[in-house]
């Protein structure tokens, strides 16, 4: 869990930019969802494999909404498989991994379930298990208290220039 040198609660907004450094994800927009027990990361393709007798998963994500040109392949050791119910009560078995998350200067280990969130606005939900015990204060009126997306995290879209006709 993040440490706070002044022993004060760490304020986070209902949405923040985060990094998942060990997964090679420099920036991803997250929704802090205290109503969700587990954290979830959007993946659009997954495959499991075995490495030295351990179960691993390789998965691909589009970390930015509406930017399918940006694709990141990730690998992590499988921690567990769990049945998770979504807000509509639908049950789904999901792979669970453990990885550090960074929000602003604070970094700590969290568990993430992997699922398809293609139609969702946020590519990642940060559930209450990830923030319990960390002395967080979620401000439901605030957004991006720890900064906007770093400009150089991903390439910008190339602007289409109109050609000069002769």
Tell where the protein language model's regions lie, with residue ranges.
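Pepsin/retropepsin-fold aspartyl endopeptidases
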Residues: 1-166
């Amino acid at each position: 869990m993040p440490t706070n040198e002044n022993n004060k609660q760490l304020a986070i907004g209902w949405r923040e930019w985060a990094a998942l450094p060990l997964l090679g994800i420099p920036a991803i927009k997250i929704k802090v969802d205290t109503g969700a027990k587990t954290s979830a990361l959007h993946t659009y393709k997954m495959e499991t494999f075995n490495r030295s007798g351990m179960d691993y998963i390789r998965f691909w994500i589009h970390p930015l909404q509406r930017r399918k040109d940006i694709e990141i392949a990730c690998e992590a050791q499988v921690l567990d498989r769990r049945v998770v119910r979504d807000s509509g009560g639908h049950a789904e078995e999901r792979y669970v991994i453990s990885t550090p998350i960074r929000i602003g200067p604070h970094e700590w280990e969290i568990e993430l379930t992997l699922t398809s969130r293609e139609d969702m606005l946020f590519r990642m939900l940060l559930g209450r298990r990830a923030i319990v015990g960390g002395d967080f204060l979620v401000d439901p009126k605030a957004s991006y208290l720890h900064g906007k997306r770093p400009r150089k995290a991903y390439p910008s879209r190339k602007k289409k220039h109109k050609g000069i006709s002769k």
